């Protein structure tokens, strides 16, 4: 990918009562690329003006600066300026940024799961689901904070869940700059019916696609979440933007149904038994995740002290979607595995550890099974979900007040682009490389300490790891038979 042929189109409107002759001109700033056309418009006419590389060879661009997702390269952007002039005077102008990249997908995988490619290279999707703020109380400050956390976590794709909205221009601008891919759904979900006014829906769809299609971060169109498309939606989307892939709903065409959604014993992720629906660490999973208890400060924002401790199940369940995530039962039992708590302060601290360990385990299990390196082919995971739309006891990487939980930092660790990890089922150490570059003569080291900080095991190994590769089961950690029940593992790469 060292050359590109760009096509530029712009709608020009003549709102006057007479015919107008005008010049439509464009410039890719900083690249010495200019092009223009003289046209005539009838009164009230709207026309799409297209500049093709065949007609304007200067739109054949050499020495490309490609746009890449997070960890894959730099998300380079270009700027396009367009003007329309009448009798030598600029009547209107616009400015937009765009990126040069190619995003495709297919089902040429062992299990026919959907595989994405960026600029011709396979990309393992380590993504997440985005739920809009519960009352749509958006601000640029909140949007920036949430996307900054999203990038910090290391995920590379954000799914705009079908029960949500199409986010702001500023949201997509930040995704462009941060290298975050976006999977856009269009306001239909399995627990709602089709719109009463389909013409209005399609008009809104057209407006949204036109608004978002210049953003290089926009990667994929999906009509709905677990539902069917509105008749005519696919044809309209493809007419407006044939450069991106499309599927009817979130669980078809190589994307299977999701789960799990609740906390489980972390070992179940390694065993691939975390979902009651069967194997879900395989193929492309659009919804796989678990909640995390928010910080104590946030819990005190959610409910009165008398309901916090001892846990008032009725109140906790109300702030858990009717008890959907089992925070007052299953999550409580997992916290109690670290000892019965005597106060909400103690419970909240242990609750952070439970959520963090589950999040880290989920990501590391998917790292292990990345593409064709693991026990089964995995092309992508979308975590369910990572932001927090309302005050609730089932927080995610951060809570509604934008206070991070331990899950953010454990996810950040698991998704670092060059990462050493431990399999608690096999006692094996592996290394995952998410860069499109190789690393030679790196040392992976494992140290084990008992509860008294005494080192009881140490081993290191030199490795060469190729681009986007996983080296699984490099060596086993042999734990001494007399090790303290609580012990610590430290992994390092250097």
Feature locations, PLM:
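Beta-sheet entry/capping signal
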Residues: 156-157, 179-181, 219-220, 243-245, ...
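Secreted/periplasmic carbohydrate-active enzymes, especially glycoside hydrolases
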Residues: 1-161, 166, 368, 372-378, ...
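Alpha-helical structural signal in soluble globular domains
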Residues: 83-85, 170, 174-180, 211, ...
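Active-site region of glycoside hydrolase catalytic domains
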Residues: 92, 206-314
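Substrate-binding clefts and catalytic carboxylate motifs of secreted carbohydrate-active enzymes
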Residues: 272-447, 455-458
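Flexible loop/turn segments at secondary-structure boundaries
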Residues: 106, 132-134, 165-168, 190-192, ...
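Active-site-adjacent substrate/metal-binding segments within catalytic domains
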Residues: 89-220, 317-356, 431
């Amino acid at each position: 990918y060292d050359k590109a042929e760009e096509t530029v189109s712009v709608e020009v409107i003549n709102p006057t009562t007479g015919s107008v002759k005008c010049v439509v001109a464009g410039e890719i700033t900083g690249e010495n690329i200019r092009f223009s056309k003289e046209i005539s418009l009838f009164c009230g006419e709207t026309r799409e003006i297209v500049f093709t590389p065949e007609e304007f060879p200067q739109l054949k661009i050499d020495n490309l600066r490609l746009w890449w997702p997070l960890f894959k390269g730099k998300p380079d952007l270009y700027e396009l300026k367009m003007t329309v002039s009448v009798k030598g005077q600029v009547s209107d102008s616009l400015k937009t940024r765009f990126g040069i990249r190619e995003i495709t997908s297919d089902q040429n995988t062992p299990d026919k799961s959907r595989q994405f490619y960026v600029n011709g290279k396979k990309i393992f999707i380590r993504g997440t689901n985005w739920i809009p703020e519960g009352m749509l109380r958006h601000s640029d400050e909140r949007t920036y904070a949430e996307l900054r956390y999203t990038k910090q976590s290391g995920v590379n794709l954000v799914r705009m869940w079908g029960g949500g909205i199409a986010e702001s221009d500023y949201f997509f601008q930040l995704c462009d700059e941060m290298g975050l891919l976006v999977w856009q759904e269009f306001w239909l979900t399995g627990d709602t019916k089709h719109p009463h006014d389909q013409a209005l829906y399609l008009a809104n769809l057209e407006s949204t696609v036109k608004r978002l299609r210049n953003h290089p971060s926009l990667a994929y169109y999906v009509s709905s979440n677990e539902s069917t498309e509105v008749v005519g939606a696919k044809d309209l989307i493809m007419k407006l933007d044939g450069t991106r892939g499309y599927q009817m709903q979130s669980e078809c065409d190589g994307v299977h149904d999701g789960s799990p959604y609740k906390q489980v014993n972390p070992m179940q992720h390694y065993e691939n038994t975390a979902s009651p629906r069967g194997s879900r660490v395989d193929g492309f999973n659009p919804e796989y995740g678990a909640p995390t208890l928010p910080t104590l400060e946030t819990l005190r924002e959610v409910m009165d002290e008398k309901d916090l401790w001892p846990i008032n199940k009725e109140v906790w369940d109300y702030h858990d979607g009717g008890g959907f995530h089992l925070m007052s039962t299953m999550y409580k039992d997992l916290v109690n595995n670290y000892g019965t708590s005597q106060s909400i302060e103690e419970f909240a601290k242990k609750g952070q550890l439970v959520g963090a360990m589950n999040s880290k385990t989920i990501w590391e299990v998917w790292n292990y099974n990345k593409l064709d390196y693991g026990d089964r082919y995995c092309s992508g995971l979308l975590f369910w979900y990572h932001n927090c739309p309302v005050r609730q006891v089932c927080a995610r990487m951060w809570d509604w007040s934008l206070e991070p939980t331990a899950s953010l930092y454990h996810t950040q660790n698991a998704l670092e682009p060059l990462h050493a990890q431990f399999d608690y089922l096999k006692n094996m150490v592996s290394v995952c490389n998410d860069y499109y570059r190789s690393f030679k003569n790196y040392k992976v080291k494992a140290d084990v300490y008992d509860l008294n900080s005494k080192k009881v095991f140490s081993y290191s190994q030199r490795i060469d790891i190729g681009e986007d590769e996983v080296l699984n089961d490099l060596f086993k950690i042999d734990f001494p038979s007399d090790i303290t029940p609580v012990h610590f593992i430290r992994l390092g790469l250097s």
